[in-house]
Amino acid sequence: MPSSAHLQDPPPLLSRTLTQNEGQTSLRQSSSCGPSAASASESLSGSTESRIPHSKMLQGKLPRNIPLEYPAGLYCCYVVIIVLSVAVVALSVALSVKKTAQISTINTYAACPRNWIGVGNKCFYFNEIPSNWTLSQTLCKEQGAELARFDTEEELNFLRRYKGSSGYWFGLHRESSAHPWKWTDNTEYNNSVSIGGDEKHGFLSDNGFSSGRGYIVRKSICRKPNSYTSQCL
C-alpha cells in the first residue's frame, strides 16, 4: 500500500499546471477590470474640468497674439491727453503771435523822437510856435522832416482829431489857383480831400483844409518817417 504522504502531495507536473492556470485566471480578471477603470478615470477627469471656470478655459484656448479688450477708462485717458496737448500747442501759438504783435507795436511807436507822435510808420510833430509857411517848412527840415502830408485815411483822421481848434500849416502849395496842388517834394496832390479858397498855401482849420496867404503866421505840423521803419526798409 502506498503511504499517505504520497497520496496527499500532487505530482510536480500537476502543481505547475495549476499555478499557470491561476495566473491566467488572474490576468483575465485584470483585463476585464480595464474598461471600468478607464471609465472611472475619464469620469474623474471630467469632474475636474467642470470645476475650472469657463472664462479661464476660453482664455487658455485663445492665441497669445490676440490682445484682450482695453477698459473704457484707458481710452478716455488717451482722449484727454490728446485734447490737452492740442490746447497747450494752440495756447503757445496764440501767446507767441500776441507777443510778436506787441513787439511790432512798440517798435512802430517808440522809435519816434520825444514829443513826436507815431502814426503807422510816420512820426508827426505839432509845432506850437507860429510862423509863416516858408519858415515853418525850414523849421521842419532842421529836424529832418517836412511840412506834414497825409498818405492814408488813418493819417488824415489823426490830423483832424489831434489839431484842436487852431489852424496849422501843412505841406501843400501851388503857383496859382490855376495850377494843381503839390506837396513839398513837388509830387502832385490827388485831391482826395478838397481844399477851399484861392490862395497858394494849404493849412488845416476847423472847417477842414483851406488855402491861405503864405506870409500869415500859424502853427505848423511836421512829418518824417519812423526811424525804425527806415532802418528795416
Curated annotation (Swiss-Prot):
Source organism, top-level taxon: Eukaryota
Region listing for Disordered, in residue ranges: 1-52
Keyword vocabulary terms for this entry: Cell membrane, Glycoprotein, Lectin, Membrane, Receptor, Signal-anchor, Transmembrane, Transmembrane helix
Cellular component, GO annotation: cell surface; endoplasmic reticulum; external side of plasma membrane
Annotated transmembrane regions: 77-97
GO-annotated biological processes: negative regulation of osteoclast differentiation; protection from natural killer cell mediated cytotoxicity
Subcellular location as annotated: Cell membrane
Major subcellular site: membrane
Biased composition annotated in UniProt, kind: Polar residues: 16-29
Topology, Extracellular side: 98-233
Residues that carry a glycan: 132
Ranges of biased composition (kind: Low complexity): 30-50
Molecular function, one GO term: natural killer cell lectin-like receptor binding
Domain C-type lectin: 119-228
Pfam families for the chain: Lectin_C
Stretches assigned to the Cytoplasmic side: 1-76
Membrane topology: Single-pass type II membrane protein
Listed Gene3D superfamilies: Mannose-Binding Protein A, subunit A
Entry annotated with the keyword Protein biosynthesis: no
Entry function: Lectin-type cell surface receptor.
Name used for this protein in its record: C-type lectin domain family 2 member D5
Source organism per UniProt: Rattus norvegicus
